[in-house]
From Swiss-Prot:
Protein name as annotated: Methionyl-tRNA formyltransferase
A GO cellular-component term linked to this record: cytosol
GO biological process: conversion of methionyl-tRNA to N-formyl-methionyl-tRNA
The family this protein is said to belong to: Belongs to the Fmt family.
Reactions listed under catalytic activity: L-methionyl-tRNA(fMet) + (6R)-10-formyltetrahydrofolate = N-formyl-L-methionyl-tRNA(fMet) + (6S)-5,6,7,8-tetrahydrofolate + H(+)
MF-aspect GO terms: methionyl-tRNA formyltransferase activity
Binding residues annotated for (6S)-5,6,7,8-tetrahydrofolate, in chain numbering: 110-113
Gene behind the chain: fmt
Alphabetized UniProt keyword annotations: Protein biosynthesis, Transferase
Entry keyword Glycoprotein: no
Protein EC: 2.1.2.9
Pfam families linked: Formyl_trans_C, Formyl_trans_N
Broadest EC class assigned to this enzyme: transferase
Source organism (scientific name): Bacillus cereus (strain ATCC 14579 / DSM 31 / CCUG 7414 / JCM 2152 / NBRC 15305 / NCIMB 9373 / NCTC 2599 / NRRL B-3711)
Length: 314
């Protein structure tokens, strides 16, 4: 039986681990990030992958730094024939990459060489792409730069969010891995080098990227809101207060107005001008310190005026 070590951390990777188990491989160990404090009460919480591994009685390693010798030697001691990684969250050292008979492969949520990095799902939507996909490739020390083994495309729908696309790609990744591993073991795959001239990056989202830039086009603002839903959530400011924007709709604007200005207030939301003739009607939001709510609920208690400017004093 093929011995496999799986390395992964978030929800996205749980179906991948589950599929390895279902396909009959001997998963001899799981490597994931350490438990972290979560929520206001800072409750120490295991990663989703650790929870799944423990359901199946699989040994779990949680190195703080996988590149340290005493940590990676614990992985090598498991003597895997194959290592599968998916959103593990640390750079894996060569000592691990070169050890398994069948190599170390990674399940990445983009059509490489596009969108290397830790947030490819967010960027695919924020950049307005109509398709993305899954790439399975050999791992190298350089970020997401290994030779490609297999790929599958996934359509991005008009109202897609990072949350919905996350679920689709998670299942697509598990399915593609299930088809890829047997071909890899049988030596039936021809690795393809990535075209370095076509490389783009999707680095982890920073706080300053979450703020809506109303000077962009309506389409770009709409994509920004979708791409940060349901985490970390786009935000703007209204009357100097931070407001998270969970959802908005593209609407035509007939009268020119300064970007970021409220140009209409309707029953289900208020329309904000952008840099072109497409505005964004905010329909779901979350004022600072309050729960997520529909804009119609918000407007029952707060009455912004037409001409109010959003995005100031952030």
């Amino acid at each position: 039986m093929i011995k496999v070590v799986f390395m992964g951390t978030p929800d996205f990777t749980v179906p991948v681990l589950r599929r390895l188990i279902e396909d009959g491989y001997e998963v001899v160990g799981v490597v994931t990030q350490p438990d972290r404090p979560v929520g206001r009460k800072k409750v120490l919480t295991p990663t989703p992958v650790k929870v799944e591994a423990e359901k199946h009685g699989i040994p779990v390693l949680q190195p703080l730094k996988i590149r340290e010798k005493d940590e990676y030697e614990k992985v090598l001691a498991l003597e895997p024939d194959l290592i599968v990684t998916a959103a593990f969250g640390q750079i894996v050292p060569n000592e691990i990459l070169e050890a398994p008979k069948y190599g170390c492969i990674n399940v990445h949520a983009s059509l490489l060489p596009e969108l290397r990095g830790g947030a490819p799902i967010h960027y695919a939507i924020m950049e307005g792409k109509e398709k993305t996909g899954i790439t399975i490739m050999y791992m190298v020390e350089k970020l997401d730069a290994g030779d490609i083994l297999t790929q599958v495309e996934v359509e991005i729908e008009e109202r897609e969010t990072t949350g919905s696309l996350f679920d689709k790609l998670s299942e697509a990744g598990a399915h593609l891995l299930s088809k890829t591993v047997p071909l890899l073991i049988q030596g039936k795959l021809e690795p393809i080098k990535q075209n370095e001239e076509e490389v783009t990056f999707a680095y982890n989202i920073k706080r300053e990227q979450e703020k809506i830039d109303w000077t962009k086009t309506g389409e770009e603002v709409y994509n920004h809101i979708r791409g940060l839903n349901p985490w970390p959530v786009a935000y703007t400011t209204l009357a100097g207060q931070v407001v998270k924007v969970w959802w908005g709709e593209k609407v035509p604007i007939t009268e020119p107005a300064e970007a970021g200005t409220i140009v209409a207030i309707e029953e289900d939301g208020f329309v904000v001008a952008t840099s072109n003739e497409t505005g964004v009607k905010i329909t779901e939001l979350q004022p600072s310190g309050k729960k997520r709510m529909s804009c119609s609920q918000f407007l029952r208690g707060t009455k912004p005026e037409i001409g109010t400017k959003l995005g100031e004093n952030a």
